Regions:
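Intrinsically disordered, low-complexity terminal tails and inter-domain linkers enriched
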Residues: 3-17, 273-304, 378-393, 437-475
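Domain-level signature for soluble enzymes in the chorismate/prephenate branch of the shikimate pathway
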Residues: 294, 388-650
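Polyanion/phosphate-binding surface patch
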Residues: 59-91, 134, 527
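Short, glycine/charge-rich beta-strand/loop segments that flank catalytic centers
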Residues: 61-68, 116-127, 174-185, 509
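Positively charged, Gly/Ser-enriched RNA/tRNA-binding surfaces
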Residues: 36-54, 65-68, 76, 98-111, ...
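Acidic, His- and aromatic-enriched active-site or binding-groove loops in soluble protein domains
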Residues: 79-87, 192-212
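Beta-rich nucleic-acid/ligand-interaction surfaces
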Residues: 61-78, 178-188, 316-324, 580-581, ...
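Auxiliary tRNA-acceptor-end handling modules of aminoacyl-tRNA synthetases
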Residues: 18-36
Length: 650
């Protein structure tokens, strides 16, 4: 009896030890517990019910897809999981649900009657920066409308999105429209395939600063260069569409490029106004705050249509390049990440259906995880609205990440120059958050100078109010959060700040898809490769012998990309300080580091062997906040004017 019990106990212990090894999930993946799973189920059923009521039929596709077939459908870059099957085919765990449905329709439903209305609920995985807190697996609730083009298809797609948001009871949402067509028309006039590829990659990466640098290096004419540079910066209401068409004319394009967007908004307004529904949406907290008297946006800057629930932003370039026209992102719950994305992809089925050269198609997908977060945020907002004091506290100031260290003085000078109160930043003590305000309502001017003064004259009339004397709208209250420059991108990406400042290097290393808007022209330094002067040639000999270089750096992503671009194999050793010691003590062959004056290199007897890039401070924003809160763009415009003065003066 005792022996049998001992054997059972031994087996139980072995099973427990096995479970101990499985007690955590891989990074970027997590378990869903019953309470959350039930909430997700209810959301999924509600959304699926909306899709089903409009005749959308369910389909399912495999989790694994042949990579070559997906590549033929569009640009696929964020596929973290790849494997070979027994036949030697390269398979991927799908990062997208639209392309598998394109494959399904192309192979199994070619003879189906059009239009096809399909829906799905399916998980997918996408690459994310390690230790960023971002999930690598999420579930999409989506639909595809195949065979219905033009205004009718666009209106059906967007209307179904609106109905789904209403069915979920979301009281605060925003739909932001863009279009791929204007940008592609401009690129078609470049006549330079390499330039077009580089420009498209930079816009996909939200890097508008390097976009300007690349355009300046090109030989295209000034009107076209200006149009390409300005287009992804355009945002707002109908006036943004007017400016798109103006830029097109300047670039030699006579046909208006915004007709589809104008028609879409007009039909949506007619449909929902006629139905007596309105949008069912109140402007989100940022929009509501921006609409308060005295400190607000002009009518041209405020969101328009469906009670402020619609706007345009031509920086929207969805991550997959199969889109051909309308693209859109949906925000809800005043959260910075979109709860859904979609658009039109009219070329995906070219030649697929008999006797039809082109079959239009459009689709949209909600993120179940983000919808659940938005629903929770909306419920919290409704509960808080019952308490007036709590509701007032929820009107948050614009939050700006201010770096410590070498960029601190330049950042304070820039913020002061554009009219913000920086007195608390000069000696913050141990405070991590500094409360401040925009001083524009307290001065009579508005013309920005490099030195931080404001010039101008008071409007006529002794009784003119402060708001009447403003050269532009006030940003209102702000909060400065004091962070390390290397941490600023994480705070902005994670919603801890709306915007911030850091070096170009920190943005590259973080790789969080933030929107880079302004080169601030301070904090200049160079990225260099260096080695000990007394061992000149040793690194080359070691490379010839080993086939790789050993390199110490604090910037592994930048260093790896540079060596890869030169076809050099390099083993990167990541250090966090005293990088120069790597080759001095014989741990590495060379270093990759920053230098401003070269003093540290000389003092440690290091000589430069390569130049990687130049680096300056940049103003960057959370893309969602830039689309939801016009104060972010207002600050960016002021900073751009200030930086332009600095750039002109060298």
């Amino acid at each position: 009896m005792d022996d049998a019990r001992a054997r059972r106990d031994g087996r139980a212990q072995a099973r427990w030890e096995g479970l101990e090894l499985m007690k955590t999930t891989p990074w970027g993946f997590r378990d869903i517990l019953p309470e959350e799973a039930q909430a997700r189920e209810e959301i999924a059923q509600t959304v699926a019910g909306c899709f089903k009521s409009h005749g959308y039929l369910p389909v399912e596709t495999p989790l694994l897809e042949d990579k070559s077939s997906l590549d033929r459908g569009g640009r696929i870059t964020d596929t973290p999981f790849k494997l070979f099957d027994d036949d030697g085919r390269l398979l991927v765990v799908r990062p997208d649900n639209t392309l598998p449905i394109v494959r399904l329709v192309s192979t199994r439903l070619r003879d189906a009657a059009l239009p096809l209305r399909l829906r799905y609920e399916a998980p997918l995985v996408r690459a994310q920066p390690r230790n960023s807190g971002a999930a690598r697996q999420f579930t999409q609730l989506g639909f595809e409308l195949i065979g219905e083009g033009g205004d009718a298809g666009d209106v059906e797609m967007v209307s179904l999105v609106i109905e789904s948001l209403q069915a979920l009871g979301l009281t605060s949402w925003r739909i932001v429209f863009g279009s791929v067509r204007p940008f592609m028309e401009l690129l078609a006039r470049c006549g330079d395939a390499s330039l077009s590829s580089d420009v498209l990659s930079l816009v996909h990466a939200n890097n508008l600063v390097d976009l300007d640098t690349r355009l300046a290096q090109s030989s295209i004419g000034e009107p076209l260069r200006r149009a390409i540079s300005e287009l992804p910066r355009l945002h707002g209401g109908i006036e943004a569409l007017d400016r798109v068409d103006e830029l097109a004319v300047l670039a030699g394009i006579e046909e208006p490029l915004t007709g589809e967007l104008r028609a879409l908004v007009q039909r949506l307004e007619q449909r929902f106004t006629k139905a007596g529904e309105g949008a069912g949406a109140a402007p989100d907290a940022a929009g509501a705050q921006a609409g308060k008297a005295g400190s607000t946006l002009s009518s041209s800057e405020a969101p328009f249509g469906l009670d402020g629930a619609l706007s345009f932003d031509f920086s929207i370039m969805n991550s997959f390049d199969y889109y051909t026209g309308l693209v859109l992102k949906v925000y809800a719950g005043n959260l910075p990440d979109p709860v859904g994305t979609g658009g039109r992809y009219d070329s995906a089925f070219d030649g697929v259906f008999p006797e039809l050269d082109r079959v239009p198609a459009a689709g949209f997908a909600f993120s179940l995880e983000r919808l659940e977060g938005a629903c929770t945020a909306s419920e919290d907002a409704r509960d808080a609205s019952a308490d007036h004091a709590v509701a007032r506290a929820m009107e948050e100031p614009l939050r700006i990440a201010v770096p410590k260290g070498s960029l601190n003085a330049g950042t304070i000078a820039a913020l002061e120059a554009v009219g913000l109160d920086v007195s608390g930043l000069r000696d913050p003590g141990r405070h991590l958050i500094i409360h401040a305000r925009d001083l524009r309502g307290e001065v009579a001017g508005g013309e920005i100078s490099e030195g931080g003064t404001t010039a101008g004259s008071e409007t006529e009339g002794e009784g003119a109010s402060a708001s009447a004397r403003l050269a532009g709208p006030s940003i209102g209250d702000v909060e400065f959060i004091i962070v390390r420059a290397t941490d600023a991108p994480a705070f902005v990406a994670g919603g801890g700040a709306d915007c911030g400042f850091c070096g170009r290097d920190s943005l590259i290393e973080a790789d969080l898809g933030l929107l880079e808007l302004v080169d601030m022209h301070y904090g200049a330094c160079r990225f260099i490769e260096a080695e000990p002067a007394g061992r000149a040639g040793a690194a080359d000999r070691a490379y010839a012998r080993r086939g790789c270089l050993r390199v110490a750096t604090k910037y592994p992503r930048i260093a790896s990309a540079w060596y890869e671009s030169r076809g050099i194999a390099a083993d990167i050793v990541t250090l966090h300080g005293n990088i120069e010691l790597g080759p001095i003590v014989g741990m590495t062959d060379r270093i990759v580091d920053i230098t401003a004056t070269g003093t540290t290199l000389r003092e440690n007897d290091l000589v430069i062997t390569g130049e990687l890039m130049e680096c300056t401070a940049r103003f960057f924003v959370n893309p969602g906040r830039a689309r939801l809160d016009a104060r972010v763009r207002m600050l960016a415009d002021r900073l751009a004017a200030y930086a332009a003065v600095r750039g002109q003066r060298g």
